[in-house]
């Protein structure tokens, strides 16, 4: 792997742990990506799609009511306003343009909450590419509005009945398909994880989130925030927010993992803080595994955070102490979901509600502290209203 164009590692994390057959395919992808990054025509087409199709830049909204009685200013980066309803659309457009550049004629993807699947389906419809989405059977059930959306836009949705019937199983099936069809097919990975060069590609195609946030907050407040906060599953919305702030040492980077029913119960999705390093999904990164190295099932109320590993750049930022990673339970996320809806008229995705919950916790801990916080509101909550309704009005998810 010494002949990759870009460094495949972040510290000791990352790499390209895939079947031999996929190594040339990943190198072809890396080559195409490096060329595209230096091609003004590609960049112009990507920028045009982001602006005129997806609706960038997204707003930076000051919360008027949530912080009443405190000295905190809390802003939300509104990725929920992006076409498709979440940050996923950003990098999907970039990857499909890359796939076309490589002459691929078919797109496959995995999805958990269905947001990446929806983003892939809408971009494939618009850019005229056939599309197959693998989704855990359990997620197909709990995210039915998104399944309908994908099918409406022409995607073939394959429910995966293996293992825990969730995101990790969908990832495995997508990998299998890709291994058999790589000559014609691009695997449009949905998060900043997996084998090199995916974590780097996804970061580069999401980093406009942090770049815009920096410009907008300087315009509004004349200074950088004290902290930016984002939810972490695989880690794409968080790395998109963090990337442009990594070199700003006065800005705290806070990633929020799902504590599920409580870390102590074992039913969570917090491998960064409560997992061990291993090889999974083509990369070396923290994973939830038992003492024999078997992957354990992660759990979160939020399908998009229900993943037993995490992107390698987050593992590295955690190791060097540049970013802080914390966890929030289902219950705390549900409370934040309701608070934002009730007090600001914005219904957030359950994923984003984890980040918001931690921001609210910080504010409550020290209401007299003057601080400027930005939460990445990575997606809208339409897809979650049935799940939340079920929990709040009897029954469980």
Curated annotation (Swiss-Prot):
Coiled coil: none annotated. It catalyses: (1S,2R)-1-C-(indol-3-yl)glycerol 3-phosphate + L-serine = D-glyceraldehyde 3-phosphate + L-tryptophan + H2O. The beta subunit is responsible for the synthesis of L-tryptophan from indole and L-serine. The keyword Kinase does not apply. It is an enzyme of class 4 (lyase). Pfam families: PALP (PF00291). The modification N6-(pyridoxal phosphate)lysine is found at residue 88. This is Tryptophan synthase beta chain. It comes from Haemophilus influenzae (strain PittEE). InterPro entries: Trp_synth_b_CS, Trp_synth_beta, Trp_synth_beta/beta-like, TrpB-like_PALP, TrpB-like_PALP_sf. NCBIfam families: trpB. Its EC number is 4.2.1.20. GO terms for cellular component: cytoplasm. GO terms for molecular function: tryptophan synthase activity. Tetramer of two alpha and two beta chains.
